[in-house]
From Swiss-Prot:
NADP(+) binds at R35. It is found in: Cytoplasm. One of its GO terms (biological process) is diaminopimelate biosynthetic process. (S)-2,3,4,5-tetrahydrodipicolinate binds at H156, G165, T166. CDD domains: DHDPR_N. This is 4-hydroxy-tetrahydrodipicolinate reductase. Its main location: cytoplasm. Catalyzes the conversion of 4-hydroxy-tetrahydrodipicolinate (HTPA) to tetrahydrodipicolinate. Belongs to the DapB family. It comes from Vibrio cholerae serotype O1 (strain ATCC 39315 / El Tor Inaba N16961).
Length: 269
């Protein structure tokens, strides 16, 4: 049984992670944390998340419960995730990262830590999205040289980073399949007189509205035809169940930097 701690357990995603951990027969809830200023610190996590009293209360720092878990699942914010990364390094714990919006320097810090501890980091933990990443690699190799490529993503009004980590992951899959770095070909905004579109660029469009959980489309457009590969999420439990699956898988892995592609065994697809 893998003991899991949920960072940000009182948030929208955190509550789903608590439920997914509780429902999976291979995992159990070990701890949960919230920001120190939260009025929910000290509340029973199970009662908060609707799974019944668990005898585990929210703490404001997972170090207070470090003996109660093997893996942290963190879908919070970059600064909070990096603090939990340091905790995992210090105590030999494992870390599943669903947080997005890291700078290049912060990502390098995570990759460096993975030399000491096992880490799974992915922009999206749904099986469907990770299959889409592989499909995009195939499509890019066939159509990338002659099609215009655009990525459109939509999320709820509360999402704070743009484009989404999943959209960037889609762009990276396409760019790498074509032998490019995304940073060299990405166009994140168009306004005014932009001139003609260059052949190699990958365009991004972002929508923030209502309660959209997550929708992503990659478009390969040629003259006379267009191929679109789309994923639509309708329930956050999709991501939560995938993250718990990753935590259970990670518990048996040596130190290293892994993605959901590794967890699902899709590398050879």
């Amino acid at each position: 049984m893998v003991r899991i701690a949920i960072a940000g357990a009182a948030g929208r995603m955190g509550r789903n992670l608590v439920k997914a951990t509780h429902q999976n027969p291979l995992s159990e809830l070990g701890a949960g944390s919230e920001r120190p200023e939260s009025s929910l610190v000290g509340v029973d996590i199970g009662e908060l998340c609707g799974i019944g009293k668990q005898g585990i209360v929210l703490v404001d720092n997972l170090e207070q419960a470090v003996e109660q878990f093997d893996v942290i699942i963190d879908f919070t914010a970059p600064a909070s995730t990096l603090a939990n990364l340091a905790l995992c390094e210090q105590h030999g714990k494992k870390l599943v990262i669903g947080t997005t919006g890291f700078t290049d320097a912060q990502r390098q810090t995570i990759e460096q830590a993975a030399k000491k501890i096992p880490i799974v980091m992915a922009p999206n933990y749904s099986v469907g999205v990770n299959l889409v990443f592989k499909l995009l690699e195939k499509a890019a190799k066939v159509m990338g040289d002659y099609c215009d490529i655009e990525i459109i993503e939509a999320h709820h009004r509360h999402k704070v980073d743009a484009p989404s980590g999943t959209a960037i992951g889609m762009g990276e899959a396409i760019a790498h399949a074509m032998g490019n770095q995304l940073s060299d070909v990405a166009v994140y905004a168009r306004e005014g007189i932009t001139g003609e579109r260059s052949r190699n660029e990958i365009g991004f469009a972002t929508i923030r509205a209502g309660d959209i959980i997550g929708e992503h489309t990659a478009m390969f457009a040629d003259i006379g035809e267009r191929v679109e590969i789309t994923h639509k999420a309708t329930d956050r439990m999709t991501f939560a169940n995938g993250a718990v699956k990753a935590a259970i898988w990670l518990a048996e892995q040596p130190a290293g930097f892994y993605t959901m592609i590794d967890v699902l065994g899709l590398n050879d697809l």
